[in-house]
């Protein structure tokens, strides 16, 4: 094999691997940011979406374009079910409460969405004593460099996304019981991920 043919072959194989990885990552969608079809025993349950709630909720607010957004800590996440508060179909409510939320994180979520074109007319901030705990700022699942992953394509090619995609398939194939699932409204429940 000549060096020219080897280079062509290498480029072709590399391109194929990138395309396959791209398609695989979108199909599995471990963080529920692409809102594609959920297939039982493949990608229906998304257990890693809870641990990437900062990304998941950010993309979901942009996708769902709610009128009302709840922000706060896990008290908001566990305590406010938007399905119970939604009075009509035109009023979309989304729970953007996150585990170990703090004023800094609430500010980030609010600032991030009010700078973009959106339908948000009301923001409800849930407060509790732990919300003002300064130790929460250093939680490893919230990084101030999260802006890197605002681009979905960059996120697709991250190593953690690949591992979480494989774990999502493993979880669904083994019919593992997923106790913590973020539903379409951002509320933490144990029912499983509803269809969008």
Whereabouts are the PLM-identified features?
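Membrane-embedded segments
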Residues: 64, 70-159
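Short acidic/polar alpha-helix capping motifs at helix-coil junctions
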Residues: 20-23, 42-50, 75-76
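Secreted/periplasmic serine-hydrolase-like ester/acetyl group-modifying domain
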Residues: 127, 138-196
């Amino acid at each position: 094999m000549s060096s020219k043919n080897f280079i062509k072959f290498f480029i072709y194989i590399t391109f194929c691997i990138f395309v396959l990885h791209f398609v695989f990552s979108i199909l599995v969608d471990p963080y529920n940011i692409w809102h594609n079809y959920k297939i039982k025993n493949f990608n229906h349950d998304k257990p890693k979406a809870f641990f990437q709630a900062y990304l998941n909720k950010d993309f979901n607010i942009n996708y769902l374009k709610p009128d009302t957004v709840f922000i706060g800590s896990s008290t908001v996440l566990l305590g406010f079910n938007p399905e119970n508060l939604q009075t009509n179909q035109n009023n979309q409510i989304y729970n953007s409460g996150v585990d170990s939320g703090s004023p800094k994180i609430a500010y980030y979520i609010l600032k991030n969405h009010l700078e973009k074109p959106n339908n948000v007319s009301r923001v409800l901030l849930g407060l509790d004593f732990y919300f003002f705990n300064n130790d929460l700022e250093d939680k490893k699942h919230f990084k101030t460099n999260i802006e890197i992953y605002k681009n979905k394509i960059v996120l697709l090619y991250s190593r953690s996304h690949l591992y979480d995609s494989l774990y999502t398939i493993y979880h669904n194939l083994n019919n593992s019981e997923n106790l913590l699932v973020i539903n379409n409204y951002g509320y933490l429940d144990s029912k499983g991920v509803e269809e969008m």
